[in-house]
């Protein structure tokens, strides 16, 4: 898979591959030889259904999602590879079925990793087929024959909620990863005299100081002089055994009138799954920022971006505003405004861990209130 984008007007082997997959998925009924308007519309529909950025352009993320979507359970044997892990809708279906029967695969993410292999082994042992951790014909047949044995809500959601509640309301000793976009030579979006790399790093530093004062162990995915790629950020975050991961970005658009703040959590319409903790935290962040600032509420959205999907802890991405909008850029360029954003996020983090009966009205809780309640130092 290459990193080059394929879009309207292109042709060639990659375009043919895209058309073939879209046909198999039922999103195209014709077989165009070039990337025309019908292909672009089909790509947009696919991106929408998969929680990807909807632009009709097939970049590396969309091409990877198309490749994963073409696999159905039974098309191939599934097993743990020592190099590149197997990914696909067939893996997600396997994980979902095992989870429904009470076997812990972790998050249903469509990636065949260690936890999925262990769950397959446990399932194989329970049904009396060869225990090798590989999902071949015999294991698939056993899966198809068995019905659900767990009820009362999706088990993965129940596990995530239970683990979250078990951590208690105090922020002390929790581990939070802060992920400022860009860094090093990558300065990100630049408009109206404001630079993405500087804005997000400044917000992260302000948030880091507040969290450290609350007893939180804080990890940053980058400093000022480096710019890790997405895979490196995911690997780093997973090694910290974090309770929560927060990624900071700004946005841009061709129409300078686009403005406002938005948050994103992991959720897949195609697989009917989402991170319940991620969704709640994204909602809390959105509400706190909008209650304390005049940024437009661009709402909370489920996405399947790898940073949200492949991180072990609940992960939320915050797009702090549009630098291509003069008003948003002016706001984000002010230190006092960035300070309010940092305050909003730390309060949202605390509200995430408070029981509903102890929670406060959006926009009213202050750090001093946490001290008085005995849940900060």
Task: Give, region by region, the residue ranges found by the protein language model.
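Catalytic-site microenvironment of enzymes
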Residues: 1-25, 37-51, 60-61, 68-377
């Amino acid at each position: 898979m290459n990193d080059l984008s394929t879009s309207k007007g292109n042709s060639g082997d990659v375009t043919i591959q895209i058309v073939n997959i879209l046909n198999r998925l039922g999103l195209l009924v014709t077989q165009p030889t070039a990337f025309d308007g019908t292909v672009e519309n089909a790509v947009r529909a696919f991106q929408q259904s998969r929680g990807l950025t909807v632009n009709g352009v097939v970049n590396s993320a969309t091409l990877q999602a198309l490749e994963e979507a073409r696999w159905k359970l039974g098309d191939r044997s599934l097993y743990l590879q020592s190099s590149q892990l197997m990914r696909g809708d067939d893996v997600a279906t396997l994980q979902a079925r095992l989870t429904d029967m009470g076997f812990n695969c972790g998050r249903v993410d469509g990636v065949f990793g260690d936890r999925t292999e262990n769950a397959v082994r446990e399932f194989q042992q329970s049904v009396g087929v060869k225990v090798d951790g590989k999902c071949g014909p015999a294991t698939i047949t056993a899966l198809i024959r068995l019905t659900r044995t767990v009820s009362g809500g999706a088990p993965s959601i129940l596990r995530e909620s239970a683990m979250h509640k078990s951590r208690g309301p105090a922020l002390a000793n929790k581990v939070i990863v802060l992920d400022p976009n860009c860094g090093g030579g990558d300065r990100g979006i630049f408009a109206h005299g404001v630079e993405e790399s500087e804005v997000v790093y400044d917000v992260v530093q302000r948030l880091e100081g507040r969290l450290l004062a609350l007893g939180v162990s804080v990890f940053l995915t980058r400093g000022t002089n480096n710019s890790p790629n997405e895979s490196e950020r995911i690997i780093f975050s997973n090694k910290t055994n974090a309770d929560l991961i927060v990624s900071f970005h700004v946005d841009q658009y061709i129409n300078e009138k686009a403005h406002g703040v938005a948050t994103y959590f992991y959720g897949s319409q195609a697989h009917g799954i989402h991170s319940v903790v991620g969704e709640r935290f994204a909602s809390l962040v959105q509400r706190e920022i909008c209650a304390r600032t005049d940024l437009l509420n661009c709402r909370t959205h489920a996405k399947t971006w790898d940073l949200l999907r492949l991180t072990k802890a609940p992960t939320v991405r915050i797009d702090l505003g549009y630098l291509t909008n003069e008003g948003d850029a002016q706001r984000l360029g002010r230190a006092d405004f960035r300070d309010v954003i940092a305050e909003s996020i730390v309060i949202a983090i605390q509200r995430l861990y408070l029981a509903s009966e102890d929670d406060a009205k959006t926009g009213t809780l202050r750090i001093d209130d946490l001290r008085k309640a005995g849940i900060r130092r």
